[in-house]
């Protein structure tokens, strides 16, 4: 739906609804977490959550891109995150690990998403689902990583 003047109902010219993107990120977190815990096959995890997501209004294409991206590039994401962690990737709490992998994927592979949006969404997701101080850890890791990964955008 559009507002008068031809802009999408959410007021963004690029057609992206930030609310739907946030929901897609939350569902992607749940899918990545389930995959980490179960060790299931990527396609099965995506199919299960995509089916469930069809009933929830969210950006399904973005959800699928995030989950596939993390599952396909897990080794590269973990390698990229390692210099910014104070412990091994597998030692990070499972929720925070999933949040960090999703955010790393967006920072490294989704240059169309501003780094501040990625970090803020990761912090809010960690607050909602993670441990008591997990969001602080996520913030510190991603702030340091973004300076390197998005040098031009962050002004470093």
Curated annotation (Swiss-Prot):
Q: What is this protein called?
A: Transcription antitermination protein NusB
The protein's matches in Pfam families, at most eight in alphabetical order, are given as: NusB
Annotated PANTHER family: ANTITERMINATION NUSB DOMAIN-CONTAINING PROTEIN (PTHR11078:SF3), N UTILIZATION SUBSTANCE PROTEIN B-RELATED (PTHR11078)
Q: Biological process GO annotation list?
A: DNA-templated transcription termination; transcription antitermination
Matching entries from SUPFAM superfamilies are given as: NusB-like
An example molecular function term from Gene Ontology annotations = RNA binding
- GO cellular component, as recorded: cytosol
Q: Its family?
A: Belongs to the NusB family.
Kindly state which keywords UniProt assigns to this record, in alphabetical order: RNA-binding, Transcription, Transcription antitermination, Transcription regulation
Gene3D superfamilies to which the protein is assigned, alphabetical: NusB-like
Under InterPro entries, the record lists: NusB-like_sf (IPR035926), NusB_fam (IPR011605), NusB_RsmB_TIM44 (IPR006027)
**Job description of the protein:** Involved in transcription antitermination. Required for transcription of ribosomal RNA (rRNA) genes. Binds specifically to the boxA antiterminator sequence of the ribosomal RNA (rrn) operons.
**Entry-linked HAMAP family:** NusB
């Amino acid at each position: 739906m559009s507002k008068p003047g031809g802009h999408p109902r959410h007021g963004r010219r690029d057609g992206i609804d930030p609310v739907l993107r946030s929901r897609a990120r939350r569902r992607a977190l749940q899918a990545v977490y389930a995959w980490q815990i179960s060790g299931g096959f990527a396609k099965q995890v995506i199919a299960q959550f995509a089916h469930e997501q069809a009933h929830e209004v969210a950006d399904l294409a973005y959800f699928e891109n995030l989950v596939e991206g993390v599952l396909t590039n897990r080794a590269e994401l973990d390698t990229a995150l390692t210099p910014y962690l104070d412990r091994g990737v597998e030692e990070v709490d499972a929720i925070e690990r999933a949040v960090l992998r999703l955010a790393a994927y967006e920072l490294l592979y989704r240059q169309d998403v501003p780094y501040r949006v990625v970090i803020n969404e990761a912090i809010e997701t960690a607050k909602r689902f993670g441990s008591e101080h997990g969001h602080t850890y996520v913030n510190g890791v991603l702030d340091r990583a973004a300076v390197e990964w998005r040098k031009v955008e962050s002004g470093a």
